[in-house]
Amino acid sequence: MVEPGQDLLLAALSESGISPNDLFDIDGGDAGLATPMPTPSVQQSVPLSALELGLETEAAVPVKQEPETVPTPALLNVRQQPPSTTTFVLNQINHLPPLGSTIVMTKTPPVTTNRQTITLTKFIQTTASTRPSVSAPTVRNAMTSAPSKDQVQLKDLLKNNSLNELMKLKPPANIAQPVATAATDVSNGTVKKESSNKEGARMWINDMKMRSFSPTMKVPVVKEDDEPEEEDEEEMGHAETYAEYMPIKLKIGLRHPDAVVETSSLSSVTPPDVWYKTSISEETIDNGWLSALQLEAITYAAQQHETFLPNGDRAGFLIGDGAGVGKGRTIAGIIYENYLLSRKRALWFSVSNDLKYDAERDLRDIGAKNILVHSLNKFKYGKISSKHNGSVKKGVIFATYSSLIGESQSGGKYKTRLKQLLHWCGDDFDGVIVFDECHKAKNLCPVGSSKPTKTGLAVLELQNKLPKARVVYASATGASEPRNMAYMNRLGIWGEGTPFREFSDFIQAVERRGVGAMEIVAMDMKLRGMYIARQLSFTGVTFKIEEVLLSQSYVKMYNKAVKLWVIARERFQQAADLIDAEQRMKKSMWGQFWSAHQRFFKYLCIASKVKRVVQLAREEIKNGKCVVIGLQSTGEARTLEALEEGGGELNDFVSTAKGVLQSLIEKHFPAPDRKKLYSLLGIDLTAPSNNSSPRDSPCKENKIKKRKGEEITREAKKARKVGGLTGSSSDDSGSESDASDNEESDYESSKNMSSGDDDDFNPFLDESNEDDENDPWLIRKDHKKNKEKKKKKSIDPDSIQSALLASGLGSKRPSFSSTPVISPAPNSTPANSNTNSNSSLITSQDAVERAQQMKKDLLDKLEKLAEDLPPNTLDELIDELGGPENVAEMTGRKGRVVSNDDGSISYESRSELDVPVEILNITEKQRFMDGDKNIAIISEAASSGISLQADRRAKNQRRRVHMTLELPWSADRAIQQFGRTHRSNQVTAPEYVFLISELAGEQRFASIVAKRLESLGALTHGDRRATESRDLSRFNFDNKYGRNALEIVMKSIVNLDSPMVSPPPDYPGEFFKDVRQGLIGVGLINVEDRSGILTLDKDYNNIGKFLNRILGMEVHQQNALFQYFADTLTAVVQNAKKNGRYDMGILDLGSGDEKVRKSDVKKFLTPGYSTSGHVELYTISVERGMSWEEATKIWAELTGPDDGFYLSLQIRNNKKTAILVKEVNPKKKLFLVYRPNTGKQLKLEIYADLKKKYKKVVSDDALMHWLDQYNSSADTCTHAYWRGNCKKASLGLVCEIGLRCRTYYVLCGSVLSVWTKVEGVLASVSGTNVKMQIVRLRTEDGQRIVGLIIPANCVSPLVNLLSTSDQSQQLAVQQKQLWQQHHPQSITNLSNA
């Protein structure tokens, strides 16, 4: 059976980023169109730019099919105005030629015709059966009976954003006039005429096709009558996010020491029955060394490991427990369970070597003292079981992800760590492999054109080579980010015998459907017994938001820094143009530039809070608490550079911010240094030079010589890497990388340009269509071989001299630059270079001199600014809080700057006499836990997995106060950070203090995190919230609404779009003009050199990039811009709600005052890989109105002066609205509103707003209006009630807005196994982008149901599909039962016992 595809036109336009509301831009003049002449096959013209991006056309170019010569039928009613671009695109694309036809493209205006042939090879199928029966204008394409493998979306033909580009153009005057949208009957080629009414078409398209919010939808600014919509703004309540957790099916073990919660969607799904009996000793269970919920995870993991996937691999298990629940002990328990069953070898992978000690502690704590843990990086290359490796035959091998790709230079049979491990395990290995914190293994599912890293490939290979291994994945963000699941192939969600053939199919399906889809996946996994996810409740935790006011002098300094960066950006651009830098060098240079830009301003933001943190920390210590301060980065690299420059001497704390900019200018400013050039060409210039500048102090010279070789190879390597990926993970280096396991916490090494979430820049995201030999990722692979060859290649000095002379550089003795280390023009020596490629380095002497001068000027300006720049935050904090003897530092840096007793400043190593560097953090942690030090400073990279809670087993049981200087703008990551101090088995819960400045939306980040903490049970200190509770804090930015709002903001600033909201009223000056200038300064708006036209950066709607970049704008500007963005986001969300397209994640029905009844249920068997699952389709009716009797009961209990019945001032359709209001917050004058048709409203109203629209009346006056609306809302929608008619109803569609009683169809159970069927039906009936809305119900008789809402018009096709699947599945079950009778010993049989 060919699966129904999607509607061609809508799939193409919506997925190419065109608003569905814009599609039907048909003017009244379009209505009277003639019936086309009865020609056998009339072919409409197709614009070239809609098919091929490569040809840049100023105007859309018609395409004609050959050899067809029949002219387009004339129109009776020709419009006077040229059609809008959208109408034009709509009509053109609606008549694409059939599959396989050859199109010849012709440009009409010029005399000479340029021809280009293109063949359409793929087309989308639509089936007649899925058409709605209502006579309404539909948009359908000619159907072709293409085989299913050819079903692709038209966006594959429309490369990149060609349609978007087309939308910006005005259609040429001589384009083909639009014709009525027609559906062609394939059987006889005749064309049926259909009505073309603008309003109807728009209504139809909105309802039937695009029930979701298109990512780039332009929301009209026109405000409709807001009364009816407002009533229905939030139709269903949000589910409370978390529910108390207790194991349901397993009754062994003691209660967990702390309260644990689970997301509400997961809590309403029950896991499978337990049939596995654990072998763990009763002593361990009775003593509570493993709690009930840890034993539950161990049991389900062991049970899941007894089943096999359809491809023959053993099934895996995913532990999604949050920070602090005790994942470590659970994993230790799984290893112990298998050890007791004679599976005595196990592999445990994690992110840091320090966690090995935790692994040993966990095994010891559960009574498994005899299981030894060995570090992989301590083994020599060779057999692990051999004598020189201590004959290790059993136990746990602990390794980091980066050590997994370690490789020995000496060769031999086991020269890679992976081969060592595979040999140690053996082919039939059926022991445990644990991937702990598996979301941290870098870049397993790469974005754009990049390749997966070696780590990712090694992890996959390990699983593929050991198919019988018992795999356990552990990750707190397990199933919240689908891309993190890239190598969880043992879950059996994709691959053979599942709805998704490849991981990429799974990702596409899930990401297209939004938040809801991932919830469905998680619920399905729990239902099948392969996933468990609990989180520590934050009950008892308190938090406060501490605002740090910026002083005038600080704002002044910040604005000066902004101006310097704007100048720097211009100079970099000018110098690159001067020396005619090639494209790839520029790409690398800008990558470094923006990366440094982001770090510079992050350092400035953090530095503004140091004084306040010190003050707060001292107060808390006096109050008998202890303090943990969280930092993201340490700035160590800057300190080392300053140290080297000063020849090992320092006279003050190093300014990290200054170091960032100085390093950028010195290393990456595009001014070729001839000294460096000579070195690269192999000319020995070690002889001392008279020209060396005062900067090159004698004590530095040796260091420079010593490092010259490294420097050159490093710079040359950078050049090859193109993106200057200095911090990209050591995964790609291909050499032994155990040394890098310490996870340097400095921003450069952990974050700088690695492919993580914080990327401000990825040079490969623009997917330039370079050939493979130019692919920098491939070049990097071959880099080592090339380097070896290069070393041996000698260079003829004469040829160099002649080349230098020819370019005007060789005539004089080379004058050395004032800066010792400057990157050569990157990529000047690509892997396949020949001597000609050096010419890109050698530019005219004049240009080089000017570029050098610019560089010197920039460095001088920086020196002036440096006087005001703040010092390194970490060093300053430690110094202010009493020095290293009072502060436990847990970071990845090797040394620090301290102030001595005599006031001098010096650099000292962090290592101590009796403590090796590798266990320094562990030692510092112990000092803190023992109470020797009461302040701990942790950096994010070094702290993963470190426990600092007020543990019952620790000496230091003071209450922890956790202060964060830098909040991540994702609530999930913030919760991860707080997991350091809030963990199981604590005496007291911690307090959190968020320090926020008034810079770019830090308040908003804080309120998002605060909202999440509240939903987890935390309390605020009093009522001092930085943001009012009615604020948008519950909306995260980084979602489709945020991206859409940002797109509208950016387009309105460059006048591509009209603004949705007015700019902040209190902004002094011309908002749009100033902000435009500011955004040009931070590179989010580009100015075309010749024309001066403004264009948006390619990633202009990337929220992360936007929030990072606007820090580089002046303080008042960035705040005004952020306010404007937040206001636009509010408007976008409100519009989405009004259009019924707001994706609220999971919705709750039946938790409030609604009455939920189950009226029907259909059950279907589905194909499941381990057990035969089933899905149920429930028909649910929900009554949510409020009768007059109920209203008067509430009214009788009201006491407030403003409580009572109100009537609307406005009369519509001879009717007034009656409402009942009750004051809930006298201080803020917030009121709860009840309505006759929709009952209690979620949104609280401000009294001032109520007074504008309503007046207070006595109950008798409200009675008639209340009853009138209550009775009519049983079957009349709001539109019909208030306006007398409903557009939807007049088209024969069902409108449920404002109805008192509504019907929902909910699909529950193993939805994942019928995903493709559901997708197919939703797509064919309701368009490609319909959102998957998850709902949680509690019926009147107490039954809980969680599932997917199926739109009414999809129910009957879905039932037909599931019925056929059900019959075939029943047959399969009977065959399976027969087979099991003949094979009673099978594992599968056992698993179903």
UniProtKB/Swiss-Prot annotation:
Keywords: Acetylation, Coiled coil, Inflammatory response, Nucleus, Phosphoprotein, Wnt signaling pathway. Residues 843-870 form a coiled coil. Residues 781-793 have a biased composition (Basic residues). The keyword Coiled coil applies. Changing S997C: In a breast cancer sample; somatic mutation. Residues 733-747, 756-775 have a biased composition (Acidic residues). The modification N6-acetyllysine is found at K149, K413, K1222. Residues 697-716 have a biased composition (Basic and acidic residues). GO terms for molecular function: chromatin DNA binding; histone binding. Belongs to the SBNO family. Plays a crucial role in the regulation of neural stem cells (NSCs) proliferation. Enhances the phosphorylation of GSK3B through the PI3K-Akt signaling pathway, thereby upregulating the Wnt/beta-catenin signaling pathway and promoting the proliferation of NSCs. Improves ischemic stroke recovery while inhibiting neuroinflammation through small extracellular vesicles (sEVs)-mediated mechanism. Enhances the secretion of sEVs from NSCs, which in turn inhibit both the MAPK and NF-kappaB pathways in microglia. This is Protein strawberry notch homolog 1.
